Amino acid sequence: MKKIFFILFIIFSITNSSYAAGSSSNTKTTTSNYDKAVKLIKFAKKYEKKGKIDKANKRYEKALKLLLKSNKKKPNNADILNYLGFTTRKLGDFKKGEKYYLEGLAIEPGHIGINEYLGELYVATNRMELAKERLEILKGCNCDEYKELKEIIDGTKKSKY
């Protein structure tokens, strides 16, 4: 009988300590500034679709600040530059948006997101030939970005962003 209690005690002790090992209250999950910015941009897009432009712009402004920090920490990252271009464009600064997009393309010329968004910027600024150049780069990707930019250039669809 003593052996059974001893064995149960050992099993109980091992089980409790193994649960404790994976559930420390000191566990800290950190989200990067880039990830926070992407989340804010997604919320901004939703607000924009609902016509809540002021709320959308506040999210874009917050995202922009986080992306600038990310860019300082990790310069030459095409994804960060893509979102920097996107947020500045959404906030009405097409010149800065174009600058960020072009910096991103210098790093990764085939970046699908940058090519699409830069094409949309060119359409918005009435530079259709440059938009068509971006479309040509996307031609072989077999992706939604190509189809969307083509429709925007053709005038059959309005840019959602």
Regions found by a protein language model. Give the residues of each.
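Terminal, low-structured helical/coil segments at or just beyond the last alpha-helical repeat
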Residues: 7, 23-31, 46, 132-161
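Register position in tetratricopeptide repeats
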Residues: 49, 90, 124-125, 155-159
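Structural marker of alpha-solenoid helical repeat scaffolds
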Residues: 73, 107, 138-141
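Residue-level recognition of tetratricopeptide repeat
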Residues: 77, 111, 143-146
